[in-house]
Amino acid sequence: MATPEASGSGRNGQGSDPAVTYYRLEEVAKRNTAEETWMVIHGRVYDITRFLSEHPGGEEVLLEQAGADATESFEDVGHSPDAREMLKQYYIGDVHPNDLKPKDGDKDPSKNNSCQSSWAYWIVPIVGAILIGFLYRHFWADSKSS
């Protein structure tokens, strides 16, 4: 277990909840072996060492994600409500607030490319339609004059 100083625990004033133990991502990254396996799912830290041999998908799957944020992989598999409930028994703390990734709502709007991509999405078909219209008119006019 990490010391409060190493983990950035809420007990020393660095986290927002004094009842929760906070772990830095560097601390979690060190726990990536079969002897000590931690992972992060939705900002929460789990010590799944005891669960490795019981995992239905095999321990290799878990070891690939060990010491890292496994949220995307966990959700991609589509775990059952029972599996999500079982996960609670391996909970040991939260990722330190300074290490959490910003949520989608926290992104800088000036870096949002959705407007640019929507223009590209519409401009190509419009230019194509205009070009086809000119070509059609040109050839239709030529066939009428012949």
From Swiss-Prot:
Keywords for this protein: Acetylation, Electron transport, Heme, Iron, Membrane, Metal-binding, Mitochondrion, Mitochondrion outer membrane, Phosphoprotein, Transmembrane, Transmembrane helix, Transport
Cited Pfam families: Cyt-b5
Locations listed in the record: Mitochondrion outer membrane
Gene3D superfamilies found in the cross-reference section: Cytochrome b5-like heme/steroid binding domain
Domain of life: Eukaryota
In-chain residues carrying the UniProt-annotated modification N6-acetyllysine: K30
Modified residues (Phosphoserine): S80
Start and end residues of each Cytochrome b5 heme-binding domain: 20-96
Positions bound to heme: H55, H79
GO molecular function: enzyme activator activity; heme binding; metal ion binding; ubiquinol-cytochrome-c reductase activity
One Gene Ontology CC term in the entry: intracellular membrane-bounded organelle
Similarity remark: Belongs to the cytochrome b5 family.
Protein name per its UniProtKB record: Cytochrome b5 type B
Taxonomic source organism: Rattus norvegicus (Rat)
